[in-house]
């Protein structure tokens, strides 16, 4: 089996192939190390290679083992809250607690698997991801052309993502921007930290206070970059950690199984084939709303009005 892709935006080879093939980075690296990837007709064994617009990537699947893991995401019958769907893409309101992509631990239930089932068991492609316990709007493409188009928008910041978070303690400044680079915590495969090192990646988050009291604040956030755990690490850095965050929250806080109170409430982009602006709002989960009420916080307006 052979596949060929024309690159539309500058990106790392392993990151791009992970999206195009619905694979983990680990599995993509195996393909590269096995000599199954060509860039502009030349074999490459460098997973960190930066590919540029109009580069041609060829993937050759020449053994059963590799073919097996290319198609390893099994469809999973799970009811989805579909905010929009057409022949090119879906916008889903992902529930808290659901993996976006299967891990190596053989979980069958994931957003990707559910979308494959919903799409008559045909392949789908993730434009971006949400943490397991982060709920909200996520875009899933039905073809690779739409995927490449939206990933290009993501890199050029014409695809915009907005979140709401319930955080500890009131703010002095009601608006602000957090510009602090992120890197992995040493000897930790899961956690990230603020760092000023060569491996740290630029990360920028804008925030605005919606409502607050002496204990907590409900804030809106816009991602200007899309690093793993970016919002959660940034909010810990400015001493307003997300409520119930198992990784970056207050250690003494009594936590429940819901996970962090972080919700991707809005996503905007240009439709890849219709070429018109699209704007979607994902409602809060009932448990999130209940938590707000328990802290005497409320939305001054519905989310779809507040973030127009």
From Swiss-Prot:
Q: Supply the enzyme class, top level.
A: isomerase
The record, for InterPro entries, names:
PsdUridine_synth_cat_dom_sf, PsdUridine_synth_RluA-like_CS, PsdUridine_synth_RluC/D, PsdUridine_synth_RsuA/RluA, RluA_PseudoU_synthase, S4_RNA-bd, S4_RNA-bd_sf
Where does the source fall among the domains of life?
Answer: Bacteria
Gene Ontology BP annotations: enzyme-directed rRNA pseudouridine synthesis
Q: Which regions span the lipid bilayer?
A: none
GO terms assigned for molecular function: pseudouridine synthase activity; RNA binding; rRNA pseudouridine synthase activity
**EC number(s) for this protein?**
5.4.99.-
Q: Which UniProt keywords apply?
A: Isomerase, RNA-binding
Q: Which Gene3D superfamilies match?
A: Pseudouridine synthase, RNA-binding S4 domain
- Has UniProt tagged this entry with the keyword Membrane? no
| Residue ranges annotated for the S4 RNA-binding domain, each copy included | 11-87
Q: Which reaction does it catalyse?
A: a uridine in RNA = a pseudouridine in RNA
Recorded hits in Pfam families, A to Z, give: PseudoU_synth_2 (PF00849), S4 (PF01479)
* Active-site positions on this chain: 131
Q: Which PANTHER family match?
A: MITOCHONDRIAL RNA PSEUDOURIDINE SYNTHASE (PTHR21600), RIBOSOMAL LARGE SUBUNIT PSEUDOURIDINE SYNTHASE D (PTHR21600:SF44)
Q: Give the family per the record.
A: Belongs to the pseudouridine synthase RluA family.
- NCBIfam families referenced in this protein's UniProt entry, alphabetically: rluA_subfam
- From the Swiss-Prot or TrEMBL record, give the protein name: Uncharacterized RNA pseudouridine synthase MG209
Instruction: Give the organism, scientific name.
Output: Mycoplasma genitalium (strain ATCC 33530 / DSM 19775 / NCTC 10195 / G37) (Mycoplasmoides genitalium)
């Amino acid at each position: 089996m052979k596949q060929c892709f024309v690159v539309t935006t500058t990106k790392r080879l392993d990151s791009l192939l992970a999206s195009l093939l619905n694979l983990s980075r680990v599995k993509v690296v195996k393909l590269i190390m096995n000599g199954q990837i060509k860039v502009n007709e030349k074999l490459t064994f460098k997973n960190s290679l930066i590919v540029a617009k109009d580069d041609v990537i060829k993937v050759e699947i020449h053994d059963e083992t590799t073919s097996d893991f290319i198609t390893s995401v099994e469809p999973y019958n799970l009811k989805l809250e579909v905010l929009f769907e057409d022949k090119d893409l879906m916008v889903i309101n992902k529930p808290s607690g659901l993996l976006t992509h299967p891990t190596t631990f053989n979980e069958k239930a994931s957003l990707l698997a559910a979308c494959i089932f919903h799409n008559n068991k045909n392949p789908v492609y993730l434009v971006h991801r949400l943490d397991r316990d982060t709920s909200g709007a996520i875009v899933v493409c039905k073809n690779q052309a739409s995927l490449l188009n939206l990933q290009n928008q993501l890199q050029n910041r014409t695809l915009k993502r907005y979140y709401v978070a319930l955080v500890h303690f009131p703010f002095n400044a009601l608006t602000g921007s957090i510009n602090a680079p992120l890197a992995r915590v040493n000897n930790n495969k899961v956690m990230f930290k603020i760092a000023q090192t060569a491996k740290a990646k630029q990360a920028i988050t804008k925030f605005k206070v919606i409502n607050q009291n002496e204990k907590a604040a409900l804030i809106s956030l816009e991602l200007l970059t899309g690093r793993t755990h970016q919002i959660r690490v940034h909010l810990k850095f400015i001493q307003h950690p997300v409520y119930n965050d198992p990784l970056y929250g207050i250690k003494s806080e009594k936590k429940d199984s819901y996970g962090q109170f972080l919700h991707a409430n809005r996503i905007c982009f240009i439709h890849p084939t219709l070429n018109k602006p699209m704007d979607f709002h994902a409602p809060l989960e009932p448990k999130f709303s209940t938590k707000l009420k328990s802290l005497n916080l409320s939305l001054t307006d519905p989310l779809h009005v507040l973030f127009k």
